[in-house]
A protein has these predicted regions:
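Nucleotide-activated sugar donor-binding and catalytic core shared by glycosyltransferases
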Residues: 1-165
Length: 165
């Protein structure tokens, strides 16, 4: 696979070892070229054996890694997903799960489902199927992100006009 992959796990104080281990296994099998992977692993205590990583990145480092990548594998955080989609990246989102100590609840399941339903990302609920998600993301044409800011401003302007009458 000759795709540059950036893995970003956010900065919340939860580990996401399960995802890092899955990527490590795919590198070991040769499914992913380890040289093409870089991860920002946050508070995870699993240290990848087969690909480069750093616990945290400053803003410039993060932007640089995002720019180099054409595939972003991320947790189900809204900011991480929207940031990658806005930059035109193919996104695989894997939800953090409470039962694995990755978050306090399972809200990321619903967030990822919404983005997937809008055809903005590839949802990967099971890290054991990450190889399938990587194939899917390469073959799928995703919708581009469109900001709703203009609609919100127009709605506010219309509301203001109505209350002035």
């Amino acid at each position: 696979m000759d795709n540059k992959i950036f893995i970003t796990l956010g900065s919340q104080k939860f580990q996401f070892n399960r995802l890092l281990k899955a990527v490590d296994e795919l590198c070991e099998k040769g499914t992913i070229n380890a040289e093409d992977v870089f991860a920002q692993i946050g508070y995870s205590d699993y240290l990848p054996k087969n690909f480069s990583y750093k616990k945290f990145l400053d803003r410039d480092e993060f932007s640089n890694e995002m720019e180099k990548a054409n595939i972003v594998i991320t947790h189900g955080g809204t900011g991480a997903i929207i940031g990658a989609v806005k930059k035109g990246k193919k996104v695989i989102a894997v939800p953090r799960r409470a039962k694995y100590g990755e978050h306090v609840d399972d809200h990321q399941l619903q967030l990822i489902k919404q983005f997937d339903d809008l055809n903005l990302i590839c949802s990967c609920q099971d890290t054991g199927k990450l190889d399938v998600a990587l194939k899917t993301v390469q073959l799928t044409k995703y919708n581009s992100y469109e900001s709703n800011t203009v609609n919100i401003i127009n709605s506010i302007e219309n509301y203001i006009k109505q209350i002035k009458v």
